[in-house]
Amino acid sequence: QLNMALMLFLAPSSDELDHVLGEQPYYDIDDVRLTFSPKDFIQVNRDVNVKMVEQAINWLDIQPQDRVLDLFCGLGNFSLPLARRAKAVVGVEGVDEMVARATANAAANGLDNATFYQANLDEDVTKLVWAQEQFDKILLDPARAGAAGVMQHIVNLAPSKVVYVSCNPATLARDSQMLLQQGYKLARLGMMDMFPHTGHLESMTLFVKTNHHKKNSNVM
């Protein structure tokens, strides 16, 4: 449910936001409460977002032993529902404030198996602590610019399944080529009307690793 109580925030400057009245706004998704600030990025269409999270969980077929990597994780929209089912979830996000919010949301929901890191995913991440870990499945939900900077690392990690959520068909098509060329097949494709009465759609794709493809020589 979306908290609909009266809330009042004042912005004395572009860098400040004072919480004057009411609770912190929140979404309830899959028995997880996600609190956020009016300045945070969050999916505006709660009902479609809930369905999108449910579909991602189903497509990834999360098992109790799975370790899951959530790239461009924001405040934990996918990470925390995934952590309800997986052994461990690592979320990576470029904005410090969102990493702090995701960490606080994990603690508030009693999810000690979700860990969050700040990183610029347009740069080489291979030497970062979280990038040295192994993951069974990966979800990514980048901005319109896509995820070109991290696609090679996703391939190197060799997860069994990848769910890519996109708001830009052009960058989704570009980034998908890396997966298709490295032994993944497109197993599912869905469209979600996140923004009714506009020309914008949210896409979700599931890629599944096949066994007959020889690994790329860059794989570590």
UniProtKB/Swiss-Prot annotation:
Pfam entry (one): tRNA_U5-meth_tr
Catalytic activity, EC: 2.1.1.190
Record keywords, A-Z: Methyltransferase, rRNA processing, S-adenosyl-L-methionine, Transferase
Residues reported in the UniProt entry to bind S-adenosyl-L-methionine: 43, 72, 77, 93, 120, 141
CDD domains: AdoMet_MTases
InterPro entries, per the entry: MeTrfase_TrmA_AS, MeTrfase_TrmA_CS, SAM-dependent_MTases_sf, U5_MeTrfase_fam
PROSITE patterns found in the cross-reference section: SAM_MT_RNA_M5U, TRMA_1, TRMA_2
Keyword Acyltransferase attributed: no
Any Gene Ontology biological process: rRNA base methylation
Coiled coil: none
GO molecular function terms attached to this record: rRNA (uridine-C5-)-methyltransferase activity
Keyword Methyltransferase: yes
Catalytic machinery residues: 167 (nucleophile)
Reaction catalyzed: uridine(1939) in 23S rRNA + S-adenosyl-L-methionine = 5-methyluridine(1939) in 23S rRNA + S-adenosyl-L-homocysteine + H(+)
Family: Belongs to the class I-like SAM-binding methyltransferase superfamily. RNA M5U methyltransferase family. RlmD subfamily.
Known role: Catalyzes the formation of 5-methyl-uridine at position 1939 (m5U1939) in 23S rRNA.
Protein name per Swiss-Prot or TrEMBL: 23S rRNA (uracil(1939)-C(5))-methyltransferase RlmD
Native species: Photobacterium angustum (strain S14 / CCUG 15956) (Vibrio sp. (strain S14 / CCUG 15956))
Lineage of origin: Bacteria, Pseudomonadati, Pseudomonadota, Gammaproteobacteria, Vibrionales
